[in-house]
Regions:
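Active-site and NAD+-binding cores of ADP-ribose-processing enzymes
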Residues: 1-183
């Protein structure tokens, strides 16, 4: 299992997808956004472009281990097992051009499922639901783009795959444009 973190101005006892996209949007796909960086989760406990909210929560969670066949990486090739499962379920081939990058594959899949020309919220949601149904649990990308092999961020498709281990009510302050935890 992987330990990850989530920051929120709201206390809750389980994750739900009905608010997916409310915090930071769906830039990295539809799902529950988690990170291996506690500092990053603390930062995102404060909604963007809003006055300081009175409450901030840091969730420590557990998610399944990543295997080559159970996740997409935004800037890496899609595992052949995922491509094959997608082709089998869709009943059509996946274009070679989209297999080179998880992000392009995800967007192509969403558009294929909805018939849209451009990927938006509905397409990202459709792709996430499809991928979850074939055993793919997440989109994954580097927490810092300059360190592709460093800490990871995750968009988990199914809330049942996220186990909350701890929820802490925290205090934060802004330092040089970042929200940090007051210890």
């Amino acid at each position: 299992m992987i330990t990850a973190y989530h920051g929120s101005p709201v206390a809750f006892d389980r994750f739900e997808l009905n608010t997916a996209g409310d915090g930071t949007g769906i830039k990295f796909g539809y799902g529950i956004y988690l990170t291996e960086s506690e500092a990053s989760a603390v930062h995102y406990s404060q909604p963007r472009k809003c006055a300081l909210t009175p409450d901030h929560y840091l969730y420590t969670v557990e998610i399944p281990d990543l295997t080559p066949d159970n996740h997409l990486v935004s800037a890496q090739p899609v595992a052949q097992a995922i491509v094959q499962a997608t082709e089998q379920k869709l009943g059509q081939p996946v274009p070679e051009a989209v297999v080179a990058h998880g992000k392009e594959f995800r967007k192509w899949l969403g558009c294929t499922l909805t018939g849209a020309k451009k990927a938006g919220f509905d397409e990202e949601k459709a792709a996430a639901e499809f991928l979850d149904a074939i055993g793919v649990i997440a989109n994954v990308w580097p927490q810092a783009q300059s360190k592709p092999d460093g800490l990871k961020n995750f968009a988990i498709f199914n809330p049942a795959r996220v186990k909350i281990l701890k929820c802490e009510h925290i205090e934060i302050e802004e330092v040089k444009g970042k929200w940090i935890r007051i210890r």
